[in-house]
Amino acid sequence: MENRRSRRAAAAVALVTALLTLVGALAAPAAAAPPPPYVHGGQTVPTYSYASAVRESVQVDTKLDSDHDGTPDTVSVDIVRPRTATRVPVIMEASPYYSCCGRGNEFQLKKYDRNGTILSMPLAYDNYFVPRGYAFVAVDLVGTSRSTGCGDVGGPAEIGSVEAVVDWLNGRGTARYRDGRTARPGWTTGRVGMIGKSWDGTLANGVAATGVRGLATIVPISGISSWYDYMRLDGVPRATGYPGWLAGAVDGRPAGTCDAVQAGLTSAGDDTTGDYNDFWAARDYVPDAGKVRASVLIAHGLNDQNVFARNFSRWWDALAEHHVPRKLWLHQEGHTDPFDIDRGAWMTMLHRWFDYWLQGIHNGVMGGPKVRVERAPQQWQQQADYPAPGARPVRLSLAAGGGGAGTIGTGGGSGTVALTDNPDLTETQAVGDPNAARSDRATFLSTALSGTTHLSGTPTVTLRFRSDEPDTELTAKLVDYGTAARDDYLANDLSGIEDLDTRSCWGESTADDSACYLDTTEVVHSTDYGVLSRGWTDAAHRTGLTRYTPVAPGRWYSITIRLQPQDQLLAAGHHLGLVVSLSDTENTSPSSTGAKVTVDLAHSTLSLPVAGATHLGTVATAPQLTVTAPATRATRSTPARRLP
């Protein structure tokens, strides 16, 4: 059943749309307001010509001066809208990538005519939705492409620049055409839906967290909800010097304009300590979930190794706490848009979602389960919520083995293990051959699962440890040992998909803007094991993320490693594995200390989020497993600075 907030919102949209359509017309007293001309059969339908759509480019004024030149920043906005007197809502994507790096699987850029007016937009949103009575608005983020100012990587300048566009669309701002004429948004109802993947989806989260009026819905795809959770892993930097580098990677201003701003970003990020400070707090949208007025449709890869899944889960939980209308799509691929995973189902969902939240059409999209989740390649399930209802933490003990693997079970923990930091340890070495004795990692194995086990939520590992150095990274990896067909989410630049030779079309095309896109498929391999989840933490942040507190060598401490959230079924007969190590230079950029660490297993535990039965028992000795990683499976390299 649709919740009351959703029904009230949709009713209000329908009323406003009808009134705006009838401005200047005299309706019969008893007649029902007719729907807009592009609504038929309970949905928007292709009505307007995409080829003859209005295409215009404007500069929106802001109150920002992010480049400190004494002149307010302006934001470049490109618009494609139906040629009609009927006011229409807006689908908007703000991005830093329109001129530098491209959008979508085919890395498309904006293209302009000789007068500087938009000619071709990336992606299919304009092709598909403009004929159906929507405008599509593409915003160049401050400091990029044709906008002025300097970007601040998810900070007040970037969020404020996009918020200014929402304000203008609702009559609260000013803008000009490129020839200086005043641009007025009299063609829109003012209802805006933001969408975008990665950094673009992050902007949707950030603008929604301001509570700006007129933003009715957002669709963040692989979006960041906290830049600390993107660039730091509980105190461990993923890459050094990253904020300034990232701002520079998308910088569209004349050389040198933003150098000082970018240097300040890197300094404020504080690589030295890894602390969560005011810089990161200004880029953390989760605490402001209570300000969100928009509904939220989240899509995220559970195995996204660019924007880790913690970014969706913390945001989802905060939105739930404040009763924000929301739905969630989860898949097993990496940093990928659902358009390239389950294209037909995703476009159907977007169509219904925007019809409901922007047009006020009561189509039932908010009914039924909140979550659609892919738990294995192309095996989608509906789920009432995330984590799955009834999921609870199951605490398992760890015990030492006789020089090889230790055990995971329901009995008591015992023994100790010693670890020596090895910055050259690869993930394949760490999780492969789990029974082999190694000084740089410890492995623990369960009995064979007696039935299918459903993991849904965030695993954690709590360790009692001592170190001979004042600081060290601690790494934990949860592994499913057993042969199965698994998505290779590391393939093709962490996407997990590959192109086919065919194309499918979504909307109308012109000679300059095709609506046809390469079809794709998931990269799937049969493997003997799969890493379910990873987690990292810094020993000097064991008491909190705001203060670097070195450990006293030789003293015992307790620390909890939060792994990334997951939702997956473990098959009967498989073995659950836990791998604990120190530095992980394939995923992070720690200051490797060469520490020697001892773990007290009697006071260490693995906590699994299990929905239903656990199907694990006690085990006296670790099972002997033989596993082989296929040569075709993608491998990692030293972590590079990459674009979100």
Give names to the regions the model predicted.
Residues 45, 64, 72-73, 77, ...:
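Accessory cap/linker subdomain of secreted extracellular hydrolases
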Residues 292, 298-300, 304:
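Short beta-strand/loop motif that positions the catalytic acidic residue
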Residues 130-146:
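Conserved alpha/beta-hydrolase
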Residues 145-166, 173, 338-346:
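Catalytic nucleophile-loop/oxyanion-hole region of alpha/beta-hydrolase
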